[in-house]
Structures are given as C-alpha cells and as structure tokens.
Amino acid sequence: MNLHEYQAKQLFARYGLPAPVGYACTTPREAEEAASKIGAGPWVVKCQVHAGGRGKAGGVKVVNSKEDIRAFAENWLGKRLVTYQTDANGQPVNQILVEAATDIGKELYLGAVVDRSSRRVVFMASTEGGVEIEKVAEETPHLIHKVALDPLTGPMPYQGRELAFKLGLEGKLVQQFTKIFMGLATIFLERDLALIEINPLVITKQGDLICLDGKLGADGNALFRQPDLREMRDQSQEDPREAQAAQWELNYVALDGNIGCMVNGAGLAMGTMDIVKLHGGEPANFLDVGGGATKERVTEAFKIILSDDNVKAVLVNIFGGIVRCDLIADGIIGAVEEVGVNVPVVVRLEGNNAELGAKKLADSGLNIIAAKSLTDAAQQVVAAVEGK
C-alpha cells in the first residue's frame, strides 16, 4: 500500500525529520489559504498521486503568486494526471500539496527496501539525487552506497555516519544526515514498511539537509497492526478490480492483454502467463485464487476478470493438490452459469481427480473447453481469441 507525499511528510514530522512546511488542499480556496499560512512565496504546488514523473507531466510547479496557486488547483483538482508510471487513464488528483519553496544547493538520494537476498533492510544513498534510483543503478552503480541493518541491533548511528562520509558530507551535515538516517530506519521498522525513499534529500543553500520529497510503501500483510496507515489508504489511486479482489483474498494485477487468466498458485500463474505469451497471446491479468478455489471465489474471480472489457477469452489453470479437481470443476461450472460468461473459457485441470473434473466440464453443455495439457490450453485460448 502506497502513501501520498503529504502523508509521508506527516510521518516524517512525527519522527522529527526536517521537511518543508506544507498543507494538503482539496479546493482552490484551501490552496490559497495554505499559502497565507506558510508566508511569503515562492511556493511549490504538487499534484498528489501514487506515481512518479509528476514534474515532467506538469504536476509540480513553482509559483510566485496566490493567483497562480489558484489557477494550478483549478486546473488539476478533479482531473487525472498521466505520467510515464501510470496507464493511459492516469491517476485522479484529489489533493494539491502547497509548501514553501526550498533553495536547493545539492540533491542527494536516501532510501531503504527489504532485500530478499540478504534478508535484511538495506539502506541506499547516492549523490545522484533527483533522478530515478533504478537509472542510477543501471548506468552508474558505483555511485550507490549501501548498508544493511542487523535485525538484532537495528539501525546504528555509525552506519549513518558511514553513508554520510561516502556522500562526501562534512561538519554538521554528517550529524544531520545521521539523524535523518536513524529516523527513517525507525519509521521503516515501527511502521512495517516495504519501501521508504527521499528523492531528493536536499542540501539547502543555507547548508542544511531537508526531505524535499517522500515516498512510503507499507507492507500490506502487516496493515492489521498499523491502524494509522490503514486510515491513510487512498483507494481512488488503486485499480478498482484489484481492490475488489483483495476483499476476497484474491491476488489480482491488471495487465494490457485480452486473455484473462485464473490460476491457483503464484508460481503457476506466472508460468501460465509465460506460456500464453509464448504462443502469441497477451495476458489480461495475473490472478491467483490461492488454495481455496471454491465456487464462491471462482465466481468472484470470473466477475473481476470479465469486468475488463478487453478480455476476449479466459484460461483457467488449476492444479488440484489438496482440493479435488472434480470439486473445482463443479465450482467453475456453477460460476460460469451464475456470471453468464459469454467468452470462450479454456480449462486445464491437473492433479487429484483431474479426469473426473474434465469429464464434468465436457458434459456441462457450456462453452467450456477442457484442455489436455498446459500447452494445449495456451494454444486453444489463443486460437479462441483469434477466432480460429
């Protein structure tokens, strides 16, 4: 679950981290009033969406008058911002962040993620702030400096100083950087985050460090013990199908193709998408129904898949381990009847009672094609989409 920039900075303030004074506004009038609270300009106005690349898309602007603030708010509030990280529809702009402009001397980068290979929280710092860290990692990886947190001791001040020295910081900036490092690490651990990022972390012309931007990603599996973060969730920034799937504990990710995929198991789901692609098809989604492929869950999965108007056929790939394939077939038949599926459905069943399950599908009289193998299933669903 991602947070908006203004929400990230609210958390920074709670932990004593330096950030520009700013206010999130939902109307042009609130935006003008925010400028008055902040004081004399210039100000920076920023569209609040869960996507990067806002500046290049016109969603971030430095303004010198309240009239310009009102014009910016009127132009963006209620609209959708399209960036290189969004789809063609963009993300809705419901809030504008108005904050004091900062005299930027130098831009740095500081962030942390959970590194699966080392099984540690790893902090990354770079002198190349203000650009995508992925681009820096690809083109100049030697400019990224890392430290890993020991799960027994947690963050240590010497690690912050180590990063500061590698960034070439001196004097009071080392102390300020170490404080920010310790604060971010505390937020990361106490709030069950999966990602935290300040890009850029700015050295002002006055010689101080300030968190000019903030990006936080919470671990969705830990939200049950983070009520404050749950309240910050903005579902308007999420795909409605993904939100609906989450309510049924279905793992769904929308894609750009026209072949809906329903699979039990994340690895099998990825393999299914690969083989569909291999045979010339384009997956419309990733959908893992998990181990409990009941009629209710399968029905809901069909509803979610078919809510995408681009879907021209559905491939169901189920491995019956704990759950018997004949029971899964009953669920698929019931779901197809209830939902009223009007596109071809190709089903591949493997495992416990697979033959009985395939027979039930064949005898159902519905527009369900029982495949003999995964390759056969991929070929048949691609052919169905192509009208062959």
UniProtKB/Swiss-Prot annotation:
Keywords, sorted A to Z: ATP-binding, Ligase, Magnesium, Metal-binding, Nucleotide-binding, Tricarboxylic acid cycle
GO MF: ATP binding; magnesium ion binding; succinate-CoA ligase (ADP-forming) activity; succinate-CoA ligase (GDP-forming) activity
Cofactor note: Binds 1 Mg(2+) ion per subunit.
Pfam families linked to this entry: ATP-grasp_2, Ligase_CoA
EC number: 6.2.1.5
CC cofactor: Mg(2+)
Catalytic activity as recorded in UniProt: succinate + ATP + CoA = succinyl-CoA + ADP + phosphate; GTP + succinate + CoA = succinyl-CoA + GDP + phosphate
Domain of life: Bacteria
Domain ATP-grasp positions: 9-244
Enzyme class: ligase
Residue sites binding Mg(2+) per the record: N199, D213
Residues reported to bind substrate: N264, G321, I322, V323
UniProt subunit comment: Heterotetramer of two alpha and two beta subunits.
PANTHER family: SUCCINATE--COA LIGASE [GDP-FORMING] SUBUNIT BETA, MITOCHONDRIAL (PTHR11815:SF10), SUCCINYL-COA SYNTHETASE BETA CHAIN (PTHR11815)
NCBIfam families reported in the protein's UniProt record: PRK00696.1, sucCoAbeta
UniProt record similarity statement: Belongs to the succinate/malate CoA ligase beta subunit family.
Identification of the protein by name: Succinate--CoA ligase [ADP-forming] subunit beta
Gene coding for it: sucC
